[in-house]
């Protein structure tokens, strides 16, 4: 079983610390092969180390998705759990990222955190980018930066979900966004890495998704994957498939 666990809700509907999932609830989770800890921003939780420590009793692999802003907290956690995965959400090059994220120095904080983790010898680290009209032209340039740093580069497309408390996440210029995904696919296929070839297939599938066509990779939510919200409720889906 794989799981995605949101331990801090979105900025539009922030969860209250006293209402969020507790360590006692986490202890009741089943065995899992993979766990993604996300948010909001997970590193706002001051007990994140305790959460990770408990999850490693149940999960073979853990990845935390973060904006990379809390560098000291991230580094401190990674010193105790060097096997953990860290994916820092960077939404484009510096100006684009900071406009989308609303953080004046967000890009430099995220990029600086990635560099620091790499200097520490962390292996499972990389970028995560949600592609939309505003940042699609930065898709290949950001991939090249991650490639030069020897890091993973994960992508998804802008979408809606009741969980986001948002229904206006729409890609308007679909041909332009699709073209930039196509450029990324071509870059990935030039690699000698079979893993990047599979990434190319996934990103090719995102072009289908943008145009409202059937996904190439089916959604496995509720079959071997589940989602836990900040309040400990188990959800079988978070977005359209």
Write out the residue ranges for each language-model feature.
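Short glycine-rich loop/turn motifs that provide flexible caps or phosphate-binding loops at active sites
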Residues: 1, 38-39, 67, 91, ...
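Radical SAM enzyme [4Fe-4S]-AdoMet core and its adjacent flexible, acidic
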Residues: 16-21, 54, 58, 80, ...
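Residue-level detector of conserved catalytic or cofactor/ligand-binding positions
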Residues: 1-9, 234-241
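Conserved Rossmann-like nucleotide-binding pocket used by diverse enzymes
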Residues: 1, 36-38, 126, 154
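Conserved alpha-helical substructure of the radical SAM core
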Residues: 3-4, 8-84, 162, 177-180, ...
């Amino acid at each position: 079983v794989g799981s995605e666990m949101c331990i801090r809700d979105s900025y539009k509907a922030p969860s209250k610390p006293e209402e969020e999932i507790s360590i006692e609830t986490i202890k009741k989770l089943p065995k899992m092969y993979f766990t993604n800890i996300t948010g909001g921003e997970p590193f706002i939780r001051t007990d994140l180390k305790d959460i990770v420590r408990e999850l490693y009793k149940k999960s073979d692999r853990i990845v935390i998705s973060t904006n990379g802003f809390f560098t000291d907290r991230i580094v401190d956690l990674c010193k105790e759990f060097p096997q953990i995965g860290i994916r820092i959400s960077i939404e484009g090059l510096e100006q684009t990222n900071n406009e989308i994220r609303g953080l004046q120095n967000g890009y430099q904080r995220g990029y600086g955190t990635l560099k620091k983790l790499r200097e520490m010898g962390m292996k499972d680290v990389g970028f995560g980018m949600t592609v939309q009209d505003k940042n699609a032209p930065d898709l290949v340039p950001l991939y090249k930066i991650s490639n030069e740093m020897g890091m993973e580069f994960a992508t998804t497309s802008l979408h809606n979900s009741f969980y986001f408390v948002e229904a206006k996440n729409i890609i308007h210029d679909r041909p332009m966004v699709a073209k930039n995904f196509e450029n990324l696919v071509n870059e990935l296929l030039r690699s000698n890495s079979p893993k990047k070839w599979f990434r190319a297939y996934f990103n090719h599938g995102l072009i289908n998704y943008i145009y409202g066509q059937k996904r190439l990779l089916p959604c496995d939510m509720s079959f071997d994957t589940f989602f836990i919200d900040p309040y400990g409720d188990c959800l079988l889906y978070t977005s359209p498939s």
